[in-house]
Regions:
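Catalytic-site microenvironment of enzymes
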Residues: 1-206
Length: 206
């Protein structure tokens, strides 16, 4: 877990692979640091997808480092702000869904903010947890082609996810657990641009 504070730079291989680094004037990327502070009550329900009767909490606090005690919402923001700073230094425009742990913003609202911003893609930053402290590795999530809401974004989102994940794992040395389909994530289902959720690793291991 100690590697993650500096892991933001690992995302840049995605931009290089995509041939966008030299054309950064001005490419726009949305970054969503997952979750938020436990004192911000976001337990009210919202639709999981447009028109869906299934609901989920507007936002949650996420997991917590078993050995560090660091909450996921704090780690996600720390990494996201480092990534934002580096991207700006390279000439990119960056849209953040939150820049503190106090902001009350739901997963629907995060997706809509990214949609309305003119960003070309959205990277949602998260971390995993497990009851087994030996479990490690990183993975990424994207919508499947069968997703009834954003199946049209599947191919681009999978490519985005694979590039980000491969680059991240190559630079950090973490095992690559691959891209999985996630059709029950509010932030994915309300997206109108290519989107990925990067699960940076397990906060339950050292």
């Amino acid at each position: 877990m100690k590697k993650w504070v500096t892991a933001a730079v690992c995302f840049f291989a995605f931009f290089l692979l995509a041939g966008q680094a030299e054309a950064a004037g001005k490419r726009k990327i949305a970054i969503d640091p997952g979750h938020q502070g436990s004192w911000v009550d976001m337990s009210a329900q919202e639709a999981m997808a447009p028109g869906s009767s299934e609901t989920k909490a507007k936002a949650t606090t996420g997991t917590e480092g078993r050995f560090s005690g660091v909450p996921e919402y704090e780690l996600n923001l720390r990494i996201a702000l480092a990534l934002k700073s580096e991207l700006i230094s390279r000439g990119y425009e960056v849209v953040m869904t939150r820049e503190d742990n106090d902001t009350a913003i739901s997963n629907q609202e995060r997706a809509q903010l990214a949609n309305d911003s003119g960003a070309e893609a959205c990277i949602r930053i998260h971390a995993n947890g497990s009851d087994d402290s030996s479990v490690s590795g990183a993975l990424a999530m994207a919508p499947s082609e069968q997703n009834p809401y954003v199946g049209n974004l599947s191919a681009e989102s999978v490519r985005l996810s694979q590039c980000v994940l491969d680059s991240y794992c190559e630079r950090t040395g973490l095992s690559n657990d691959g891209v999985i389909y996630a059709d029950d994530m509010t932030g994915i289902n309300f997206s109108e641009i290519p989107v990925t959720i990067l699960e940076m690793g397990y906060m339950s291991n050292e």
